[in-house]
Design a protein with these regions (language model features):
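Hydrophobic alpha-helical transmembrane segments of membrane transport and translocation systems
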Residues: 92, 119-166
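Hydrophobic transmembrane alpha-helices and their membrane-interface caps
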Residues: 23-75, 79-82, 133
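Internal alpha-helical transmembrane segments of multipass membrane proteins
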Residues: 1-36, 40, 106-116
Length: 166
C-alpha cells in the first residue's frame, strides 16, 4: 500500500508540475521520511502491523502536502523569473516565503499528536509515537531537503537549458 501510494504521488506531482524533477525530489524526500520512521520502529522495537501501515500512509500524506506547498511556490517564482535571475536564490526565496507556514503547521500537528499520545490508550500511543517522529522528519525534509534536491536535479540533470539559467 505504501509503495502504491508513493507511485501514485510520483505520477500526480509529475503531471501537476509538468516536471519529473519535482516528482522525483518529492519521492526521495518521502523515502527519507519513511526510513526515518522505520528506524524509529526498529529502535523502539515496536511491532509492525495494521498500525504501521496506517502510520506510514499518514506520514506520506502529511509530508507530501508540506512538500507541494513549497514546490508550488517555486513554480510561481519560476513563472516570474527573469532571464538573469539566480535559480539558487529563487529556491531559497521560495522556501523562505513558506517557512513560517511550514513551521506553524508542523508544530501544531506535532502538539496535537503529542496530546493524543499523552491522553490515549495503548493502541493510540502505538500510532501517535511514530507519527510524531514522522511529522518531525517530514517537516524537516519538506523544508530542508526537497528544494535543495530539486535545485541539484534542475542544475545537474537539467541539461544545457539549466546550465544557462545558472
Amino acid at each position: 500500500a505504501v509503495i502504491i501510494s508513493a507511485i501514485c504521488m510520483l505520477i500526480y506531482i509529475w503531471f501537476r508540475f509538468k516536471d519529473v524533477r519535482f516528482a522525483s525530489s518529492a519521492v526521495l524526500a518521502l523515502l527519507h521520511d519513511l526510513l526515518f520512521v522505520l528506524t524509529f520502529y526498529a529502535l523502539a522495537r515496536t511491532s509492525v502491523g495494521n498500525t504501521f501501515i496506517a502510520c506510514m500512509l499518514t506520514i506520506l500524506g502529511y509530508s507530501i502536502n508540506a512538500t507541494i506547498v513549497i514546490f508550488d511556490r517555486i513554480r510561481e517564482e519560476l513563472r516570474v523569473m527573469k532571464r538573469n535571475d539566480d535559480l539558487k536564490a529563487l529556491v531559497n526565496r521560495s522556501i523562505t516565503y513558506t517557512l513560517t507556514r511550514s513551521i506553524y503547521t508542523t508544530f501544531t500537528t506535532f502538539v496535537m499528536v503529542a496530546v493524543l499520545y499523552i491522553m490515549g490508550v495503548s493502541s493510540i500511543k502505538e500510532f501517535a509515537a511514530p507519527l510524531m517522529v514522522g511529522i518531525a522528519g517530514g517537516g524537516y525534509s519538506s523544508v530542508c531537503i526537497t528544494g535543495a534536491l530539486w535545485y541539484v536535479m534542475k542544475t545537474k540533470i537539467g541539461g544545457k537549458k539549466a546550465a544557462k539559467k545558472k
